[in-house]
Every structure is written in structure tokens, then in C-alpha cells.
Amino acid sequence: MIMKEFICGIDEAGRGPLAGPVTAAAVILPEDFEIELLNDSKKLSEKKRLVLEELIKQKSIAWSVVHIPHNIIDEINILNASLLAMKNAFENLATPSGEFYKGEVSKIIVDGIYFPDLKVSDGVECITKVKADATEPSVMAASILAKTARDKLMVEFSKLYPEYQYEKHKGYPTKLHKEICKKIGPSPIQRRTFKI
């Protein structure tokens, strides 16, 4: 008998911006998911990411997205905030219908070199992998959910703070964003520990 593998992919978006949250997602895909549709979220157009976001949410076995806000990033640093977001995303996995995921996980793959402090059952393989967001389907899916969720939140912040034009740069350290900050000062969602 062939055992099914339940692989949970975890990735984050938003480690480098000067403003806004760091966002992590965790995803468990079914074995029949059309993986050829996936790619590293950074290589996909925004339109394609949004289409895939809905598909992943509908077809996944379980998924979760978590934001850690700028003030917590300043308090515990970006690495610890990223790991906390990943931990919380894993611990809050839910089915597409919104029920808490109580099923099994046979392997957890985290993009990068640091593994969050997760409470997992014995026998669960836990690995980190650099560039997993370009090679591992469940991590690719997590990358897409994290990026789309964070981008949508930054667009909402642009409505609260239109002068910062977050809808254009999503808080990343672009020339435009740096010029705005130098001209009018930091926004209420600025990461104070990041240099402009």
C-alpha cells in the first residue's frame, strides 16, 4: 500500500520592506493539484498570482496566512518576526471550508535556512530548503498566498495613508518610497528599526 504524503509548505513575504507587516503562509496541497501552474510568486504577474491565490485556497487540503505587524518586527527583529509568522501560520492551518485542520502532516518544508519552533509529532520530517519557493509545490503555493495577502493589506494601508503611495511599492525600499519618507517623515506603519 502506498502511503499518501501530506507536505506542508511554509514561506514568508515582506522581510525587506521599510513599512508594514511580514506575512507567512502555510499550505498543504492535494497530490492531484496542477503543480505546473505554480511558480515562485516573485516570478508571476500580479494578475496570475491573484488567480492562483483563489485556486490554492479552494483546492488545498489546508492553508493559513498570518501577518506580524511592524511594531512587533521592531520589538523582536525581522528574523524572529518571520519565524513567528511561520509558526503561527502552521498552527492555524484550516480547511478551505474554514475548519481547523486536524489531519496529519508527514513533512514540513520551509523556504530558507531557518526553521520555526513548531510542535510536531514524532516522525514528521522537518526541512529547510533555500529556494524552495521555486522548486517545492507546497512552498510555491505558500509563497503565492503570503505575497498576495501582504500586497492586498498594503493597498488597504494606502487608503489610510495615501501620501505614502503604498499601493505602488508595498513598503519596499524603492526610490519613490525613500523620497516620500525623507520628505514627510515615517508613516504610522514604518519599521523604526529599518534604516531609510
What are these regions (language model features)?
Residues M1-I196:
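RNase H-like, Mg2+-dependent phosphodiesterase core
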